[in-house]
């Protein structure tokens, strides 16, 4: 065994040592790059083993020397200069079964996860390895790895490795159920609220901080209040809007108190005090909320946890989560809903709402955790008890065990003085089974069992497990007219909760006396489509040697079909679940049950496990694949040890990962041979050997049904408990310790369990899910068999020919772009389905077995002969897609259910109290299921094929991602407000401010459009002037504060992503006749404008005293002709300035705003620049850059080109002559409200708009009703060419810029990666911060109640406006006509908002057939932190919930949603911008305030005071406005008198 000396190196210090492992090729002539080597100390062969991959060879490394990166060596305790053994290993021998990867503060879509998985395949990883995927700009870290049923420290990722992505920055909703139990005491004497807050939440927040989690958290306290009333008449009128009625006729209201909303904190423990404060007054506030003087209210009581609004809470969070694509942020990934209840996990629920909740949670891939702080019951939980609307005595309760809820039980570390024993009781089924574990021989045990099973049934007639009523109903039920056979696929080992006595007696292995007539047929249960009741347990036992799941399923199905086909159908009675013995229920395997399974690791027996579910009964030894049986020590003297009575053939899988690491030889430890299971030990030689990890998930002899648990592979037994672990193992300490010592610390002391008896060291809380929640896995393993596909599904398919499509569309594009190849289209089609929640179906290829049964579980992958042939299987819910690539043809085959579930819509009313609100507001939402089969995938696939062509636009139904932004004028707001006591300090708009905003806007749009003004080419006759001069190396554009270096003379056209601009905005490098001396004006560097004699032929005089952004060296004479002005505009140096040649732009292109400003500085005879440009267009001197002659000259950032140019010139480029194709490539924005910038207008004394005789319209939309508000253009996302995929999107923007208005920009995409889009927008924001302020805003800023897509727990704050401040009670605007008063009130409110720094937002008008919708204006604060909305108060209108075609399920007792009238009070609606991370705006604390008041809260407080006329501020503002009007009238009167005197 050859030894090598171990050296260490630091990555980055030396280019030769920039890999994890550096070695000399001479030492390993047979080694290749990509090989995996195993490194360990020779004296610790069973100790720590490190696996690394060879990425390069280094000749500078000495002989017999290897070098490892120092951080890795320290983590694996490898000492420098020590001798180590290194050998090459086969990747298959060290392959990983699953790996968990964590990431933080970034958005990683499911498409990116798939690409990252492909990138990581065939690579070697180790604990804490940092992964940088530069192509996608993704940064992540290895968290945990599993192989052969145990955790390991390093391994190789293969195609079969399941990758779990966990996010440290998720959107987390914490719901605290404030039911009546919260005020009860637990067995330790603590309030359950104290247990939840001081215990669970305190621990949770500590773990968040320990793992540096940065979740965006919302904390909500919720409860249900019942009223003791028999009719609606007992309630006063003001209460009836929100009342609902349950199935028993009880009236109730649901209350939600939002304590924290969309916040991020470094230390969440500060929030605990706030929760304790809310707790003290919560119950009294809710129960007495409606109390009024001299008004009788029915008595109110707080509901129990069981009767509470548990499912409603989950749906409320889902209403927010399912709109994630509308408000996409780039610093978080993942969604988690956590309900903390003082109950025991039992809830009384509505059946329809349960079905909706289940489908929505599964389809949306949202993690849902239930944390119970009550004591765990002795039955299966979580348990949903359906409302029993049948009041007859014979009706039985119906239950459901939801697999889509991850359950945790939290208990404290306190010990009860009188006992430390936790009772776990299960009654024996038929008798003692001690003979199975007493060391009796196998033959004797089987004989005893057979004797027991063959005995007379009458001996067990009185067993309490039988439901005699159900048995009688089953026996005496009339036979159906026709025998039928269910073709639903039945899997796993099956039992029945309501069996016949015959079936029960023969339910195990005794089939001697069985006749077909004794077997009842399957009956589908209406409440849960996954649950069946039948006899598959008996049938499964016919295959004693079945070794894999799919074969047992196939054989079971065949056997059942053979028997049932000759049997009369005997239908059982009410098919119910017994929560004390759920193993008696048959579960149908569906894709829903397997949706989350790939996030769970496999235990030692190969069964997927949940690490916080601990089963106290040790596993029974298996007969094959183990070196020796798992050791179990029994002692007759240990009184605390109990016999849990395992059934014959049962194999309990201990699922605590603690057991995998335990080195104890006690009765609780797993020992294989003489070697404890440790994930640092040396691996087995080959994982392909029949090790325990490869034991199939289910054997026929187990006879199990796995109803309980999220994995779908764990059976509930009373032995399972979820009590708190004394030492949680899943905390990720190794993230901070930086070494594997932390992982070793997960092992408990050897005697941790031996001394305290059984059931003590147990894990109860899934801390990993609650701290670093897993994202929905991108793979699953369920696909229907062929028979089910044919019988239960409708099949449709279509083909795509990307090459032909690209050929057709390439001709019509304005800009040529490389089309996607057929293979790229195929990958993108798969990516889009993954992004919408689909999962890739991976099917294990099983070798044929001796039984010869063919697999019926899935469609086997096609073995393809050519590399260009690929096939992908994907699924979501009951929808399956098969995407096949064959040569240049892509075939998409869809399977949708033949009988889809009917859509249900639940109308739900509630009261919520959000932060900074003063009352509980009424709101209503709809909970509805989404018909996934209606998604238009054909349109999406053609959109991909055509690379986003306008023929296939993005539609709302495609759920594309979008990022909405407002461009705002940049002002130092916080410092202004910090220096003032009040916030109404914002001045009126001035001409200088307007010009600066417009100039800065033009700059940003140039950057967004990749247009850059810089030297590109020189006129030939100026070549002699290219010499050095003192100022020749700097240039300045407009009001820029940056200095641009002069490029080299030979730079010319480059490959820069920017389109360059040439023309007048540059300097001749030497003008001896002019002495230019730059000076500072107002702290800014002025522009330098040298004169020239080039325009002498046009009859102009040279000037250099203008500062307008252009070289001013000419002034047109009053009689200058249009051709003369046109020739001066075309001048290559002093003209208006053109963009360099670029694709889709004709040569000599400019923007109209530049031309207008160029003309303004050169006209002194009052001629209007816009009229001159329009005259040039009519004379066909200039034209719109698209070549459309019908487009008039529009002021703004609109492209035009010079028509009269040399068409034979070398650089001549004609226009496209296609207006629609042109506007799809370029952003064009019209400027309105700023014509005074290019044409002098008379100065008038400003009069407030609300006091003018004829008020000006609020925005341009009221005067240009036929003009589009938005326009959309193509957007290249990957401008830096970083991605490994074709990425593009669209930019939607306002068509008009109006100064002092917010300008909206929306980025939309489906075929782009989150990090790449984030990089693009981040560049825009950095650019904008030099000129303006680009801030992200939500799609629905106000989130008004009863609107379709609003956040259910968000709502605007109503701030009333005092309108009675005038003396003598006079009304406002009495002197004006009555019909104008409502509009004047809006303008008055707008003026108030303007004083506080709010800017108007232009929105598309809302239209409604036959309804008079009110005028409403929306505003955003110049910091972007707040929104405001004002609405006409005189319109009598109502807000309606959206009309839905589905059948409404409503519990509202007072009319419908449209009875909720919007308050007619005059005031403002105020909302916060939750898209701005609160860490940023919390940093904007007003330091000089006494309590460190936040800037936003100071704004709200001061605005409220102003509107309430505190300190007569509102009346003072009114008086000042009236004074401005009087001054204006006096000024106008004096001007009129002056003109009359002149005329006389």
UniProtKB/Swiss-Prot annotation:
InterPro entries: DEPDC5_CTD, IML1, IML1_double_psi_beta_barrel, IML1_N. Pfam families: DEPDC5_CTD, IML1, IML1_N. An essential component of the GATOR subcomplex GATOR1 which functions as an inhibitor of the amino acid-sensing branch of the TORC1 signaling pathway. The two GATOR subcomplexes, GATOR1 and GATOR2, regulate the TORC1 pathway in order to mediate metabolic homeostasis, female gametogenesis and the response to amino acid limitation and complete starvation. Disulfide bonds: none annotated. Signal peptide: none annotated. Keywords: Cell cycle, Cell division, Meiosis, Mitosis. GO terms for molecular function: GTPase activator activity. It comes from the Eukaryota. Component of the GATOR complex consisting of mio, Nup44A/Seh1, Im11, Nplr3, Nplr2, Wdr24, Wdr59 and Sec13. Within the GATOR complex, probable component of the GATOR1 subcomplex which is likely composed of Iml1, Nplr2 and Nplr3. Residues 623-639, 1041-1057 have a biased composition (Polar residues). The keyword Cell cycle applies. PANTHER family: DEP DOMAIN CONTAINING PROTEIN 5 (PTHR13179), GATOR COMPLEX PROTEIN DEPDC5 (PTHR13179:SF8). This is GATOR complex protein Iml1. Disruption phenotype: Pupal lethal. Under nutrient-replete conditions, larvae display a significant increase in TORC1 activity, indicated by increased phosphorylation of S6K/p70S6K. RNAi-mediated knockdown in the female germline results in a large percentage of ovarian cysts delaying mitotic exit. Instead, cysts undergo a fifth mitotic division before meiotic commitment to produce 32-cell cysts with a single oocyte. Double RNAi-mediated knockdown with GATOR1 complex member Nprl2 in the female germline increases the penetrance of ovarian cysts displaying delayed mitotic exit and producing 32-cell cysts. GO terms for biological process: cellular response to amino acid starvation; germarium-derived cystoblast division; germline cell cycle switching, mitotic to meiotic cell cycle; meiotic cell cycle; negative regulation of cell size; negative regulation of TOR signaling; negative regulation of TORC1 signaling; positive regulation of autophagy. Residues 615-649, 1037-1072 are annotated as: Disordered. Residues 1058-1072 have a biased composition (Basic and acidic residues). Belongs to the IML1 family. GO terms for cellular component: GATOR1 complex; lysosomal membrane; lysosome; Seh1-associated complex. The keyword Cell division applies.
């Amino acid at each position: 065994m050859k030894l090598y000396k171990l050296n260490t190196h630091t990555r980055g210090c030396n280019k030769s040592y920039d890999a994890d492992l550096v070695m000399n090729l001479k030492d390993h002539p047979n080694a290749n790059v990509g090989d995996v080597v195993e490194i360990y100390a020779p004296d610790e062969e069973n100790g720590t083993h490190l696996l690394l991959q060879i990425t390069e060879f280094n000749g500078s490394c000495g002989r017999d020397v290897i070098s490892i990166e120092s951080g890795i060596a320290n983590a694996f305790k490898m000492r420098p200069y020590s001798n180590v053994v290194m050998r090459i290993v086969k990747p298959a021998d060290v392959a990983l079964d699953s790996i968990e990867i964590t990431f933080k503060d970034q958005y990683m879509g499911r498409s990116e996860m798939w690409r990252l998985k492909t990138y990581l395949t065939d690579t070697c990883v180790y604990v804490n390895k940092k992964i940088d995927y530069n192509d996608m700009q993704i940064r992540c870290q290895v968290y945990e790895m599993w192989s052969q049923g145990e955790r390991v420290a390093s391994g190789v990722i293969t195609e079969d490795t399941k990758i779990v992505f966990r996010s440290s920055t998720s959107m987390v909703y914490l719901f605290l159920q404030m039911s009546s139990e919260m005020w009860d005491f637990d067995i330790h004497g603590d309030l359950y609220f104290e247990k939840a807050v001081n215990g669970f939440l305190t621990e949770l927040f500590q773990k968040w901080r320990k793992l540096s989690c940065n979740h965006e958290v919302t904390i909500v306290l919720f409860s249900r209040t019942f009223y003791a009333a028999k009719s609606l008449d007992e309630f006063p009128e003001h209460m009836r809007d929100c009342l609902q009625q349950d199935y028993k006729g009880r009236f109730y209201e649901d209350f939600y108190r939002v304590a924290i909303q969309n916040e991020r904190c470094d230390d969440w423990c500060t929030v605990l005090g706030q929760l304790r404060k809310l707790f003290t007054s919560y119950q009294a506030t809710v129960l007495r909320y409606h109390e009024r003087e001299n008004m009788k209210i029915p008595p109110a009581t707080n509901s129990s946890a069981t009767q509470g609004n548990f499912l409603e809470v989950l749906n409320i969070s889902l209403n927010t989560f399912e709109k994630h694509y509308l408000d996409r942020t780039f610093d978080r990934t993942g969604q988690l809903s956590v309900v903390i209840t003082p109950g025991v996990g039992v809830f009384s629920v509505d059946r329809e709402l349960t079905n909706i909740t289940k489908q929505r949670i599964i389809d949306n891939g949202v993690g849902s955790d239930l944390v119970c702080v009550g004591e765990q019951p002795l039955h299966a939980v979580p348990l949903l008890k359906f409302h029993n609307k049948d009041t007859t005595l014979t009706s039985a309760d119906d239950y459901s065990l939801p697999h889509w809820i991850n359950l945790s039980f939290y208990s404290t570390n306190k010990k009860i003085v009188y006992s430390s024993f936790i009772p776990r009781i299960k009654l024996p089924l038929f008798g003692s089974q001690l003979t199975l574990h007493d060391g009796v021989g196998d033959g004797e045990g089987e004989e005893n069992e057979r004797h027991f099973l063959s005995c007379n049934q009458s001996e067990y007639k009185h067993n309490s497990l039988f439901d005699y009523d159900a048995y009688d109903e089953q026996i005496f039920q009339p036979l159906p007219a026709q025998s039928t056979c269910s073709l639903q696929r039945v899997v796993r080992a099956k039992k029945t909760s309501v069996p016949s006595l015959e079936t029960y007696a023969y339910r195990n292995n005794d089939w001697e006396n069985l006749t077909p007539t004794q077997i009842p047929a399957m009956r589908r249960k209406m409440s849960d489509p996954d649950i069946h009741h039948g006899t598959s347990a008996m049938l499964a036992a016919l295959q004693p040697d079945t070794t894999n799941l799919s074969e047992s399923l196939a054989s079971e199905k065949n056997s059942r079909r053979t028997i049932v086909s000759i049997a009369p159908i005997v239908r059982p009675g009410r098919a119910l679940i017994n929560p004390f013995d759920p193993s008696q229920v048959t579960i149908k395997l569906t894709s829903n049950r397997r949706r989350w399974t790939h996030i769970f690791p496999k235990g030692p027996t190969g069964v997927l496990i949940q690490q916080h579910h601990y089963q106290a009964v040790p596993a029974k030894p298996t007969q094959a694949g183990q070196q020796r049986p798992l050791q179990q020590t029994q002692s007759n003297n240990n009184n605390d040890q109990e016999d849990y009575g395992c059934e014959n053939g049962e194999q309990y899988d201990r699922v605590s990962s603690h057991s995998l690491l335990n080195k104890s030889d006690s009765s609780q430890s797993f020992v294989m041979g003489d070697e404890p299971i440790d994930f640092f030990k040396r691996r087995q030689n080959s994982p392909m050997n029949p090790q325990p990890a490869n034991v199939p998930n289910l054997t026929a002899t187990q006879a199990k049904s796995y109803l309980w648990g999220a994995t779908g592979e764990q059976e509930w037994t009373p032995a399972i408990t979820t009590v708190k672990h004394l030492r949680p193992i899943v905390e990720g300490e190794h993230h901070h310790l930086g070494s594997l010592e932390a992982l070793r610390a997960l092992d408990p002391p050897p005697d941790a369990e031996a001394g305290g008896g059984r059931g003590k060291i147990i894990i109860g809380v899934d801390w990993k899910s609650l701290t670093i929640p897993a994202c929905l896995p991108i793979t699953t393993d369920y696909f229907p068999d062929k028979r089910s596909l044919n019988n239960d599904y409708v099949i449709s398919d279509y083909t795509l020919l990307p090459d032909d499509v690209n050929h057709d569309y390439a001709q019509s594009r304005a800009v040529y772009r490389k089309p996607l190849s057929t293979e790229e289209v195929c990958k993108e089609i798969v990516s889009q389905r993954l992004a919408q929640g689909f999962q890739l179906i991976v099917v294990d290829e099983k070798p044929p077995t001796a039984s010869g049964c063919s697999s019926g579980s899935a469609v086997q992958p096609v073995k393809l002969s050519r590399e260009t042939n690929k096939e992908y299987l994907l699924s979501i819910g009951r929808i399956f897609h098969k995407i096949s690539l064959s040569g240049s043809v892509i075939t998409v085959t869809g399977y949708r259910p033949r009988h889809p579930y009917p859509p249900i819509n639940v109308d739900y009313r509630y009261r919520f109290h959000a932060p900074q609100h003063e009352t509980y507001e009424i709101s209503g939402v709809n909970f509805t299921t989404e018909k996934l089969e209606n998604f238009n995938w054909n349109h999406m696939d053609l959109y991909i094929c055509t690379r986003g062509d306008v023929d296939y636009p993005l539609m709302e139904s495609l759920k594309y991602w979008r990022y909405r932004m407002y461009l705002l004028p940049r002002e130092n707001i916080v410092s202004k407000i910090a220096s003032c006591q009040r916030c109404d300090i914002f001045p009126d708009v001035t001409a200088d401010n307007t010009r600066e905003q417009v100039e800065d806007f033009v700059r940003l749009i140039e950057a967004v459009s990749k247009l850059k003004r810089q030297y590109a080419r020189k006129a030939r006759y100026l070549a002699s002037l290219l010499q050095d001069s003192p100022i020749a190396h700097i240039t300045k554009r407009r009001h820029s504060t940056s200095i641009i270096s002069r490029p080299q003379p030979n730079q010319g056209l480059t490959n820069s992503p920017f389109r360059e601009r040439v023309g007048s905005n540059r300097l001749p490098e030497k003008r001896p006749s002019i002495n230019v001396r730059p000076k500072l004006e107002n702290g800014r560097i002025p522009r330098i404008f040298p004169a020239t004699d080039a325009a002498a032929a046009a009859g102009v005089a040279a000037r250099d005293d203008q500062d307008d952004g252009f070289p001013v060296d000419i002034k047109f004479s009053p009689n200058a002709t249009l051709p003369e002005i046109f020739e001066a505009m075309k001048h290559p140096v002093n003209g208006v300035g053109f963009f360099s040649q670029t694709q889709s732009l004709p040569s000599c292109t400019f923007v109209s705003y530049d031309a207008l400003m160029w003309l303004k500085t050169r006209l002194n005879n009052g001629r209007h620049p816009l009229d001159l440009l329009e005259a040039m267009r009519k004379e066909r001197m200039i034209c719109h850059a698209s070549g459309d002659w019908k487009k008039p000259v529009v002021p703004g950032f609109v492209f035009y080109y010079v028509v009269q140019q040399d068409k034979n010139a070398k650089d001549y480029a004609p226009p496209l002559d296609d207006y629609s194709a042109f506007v799809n490539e370029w952003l064009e924005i019209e400027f309105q409200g700023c014509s005074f910038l290019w044409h002098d207008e008379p100065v008038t004394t400003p009069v407030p708009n609300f006091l003018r005789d004829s008020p000006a319209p609020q925005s341009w939309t009221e005067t240009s009703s036929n003009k589009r508000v938005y326009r959309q253009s193509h957007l290249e996302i990957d401008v830096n060419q970083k991605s490994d995929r074709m990425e593009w999107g669209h930019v939607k923007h306002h068509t008009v810029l109006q100064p002092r208005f917010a300008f909206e920009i929306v980025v939309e995409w489906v075929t782009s990666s989150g990090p790449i889009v984030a990089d693009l927008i981040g560049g825009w924001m950095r650019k904008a911060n030099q000129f303006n302020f680009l801030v992200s805003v939500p799609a629905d800023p106000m989130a008004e109640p009863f609107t379709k897509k609003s956040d259910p727990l968000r709502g605007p704050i109503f701030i009333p406006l005092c309108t009675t401040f005038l003396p003598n009670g006079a009304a406002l605007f009495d002197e004006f006509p009555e019909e104008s008063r409502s509009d004047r009130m809006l303008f008055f409110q707008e003026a108030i908002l303007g004083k506080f720094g709010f800017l108007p937002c232009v929105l598309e008008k809302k239209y409604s057939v036959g309804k008079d919708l009110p005028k409403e204006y929306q505003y955003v604060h110049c910091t972007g932190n707040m929104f405001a909305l004002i609405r006409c108060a005189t319109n009598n209108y109502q807000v309606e919930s959206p009309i839905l075609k589905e059948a409404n399920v409503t519990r509202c007792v007072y009319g419908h949603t449209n009875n909720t009238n919007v308050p007619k009070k005059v005031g403002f609606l105020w909302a916060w911008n939750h898209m701005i991370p609160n860490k940023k705006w919390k940093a904007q604390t007003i330091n000089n305030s006494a309590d460190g008041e936040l800037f936003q809260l100071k704004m709200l407080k001061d605005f409220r005071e102003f509107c309430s006329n505190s300190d007569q501020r509102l009346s003072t503002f009114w008086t000042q406005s009236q004074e401005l009007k009087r001054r204006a009238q006096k000024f106008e009167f004096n001007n009129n008198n002056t003109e009359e005197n002149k005329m006389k």
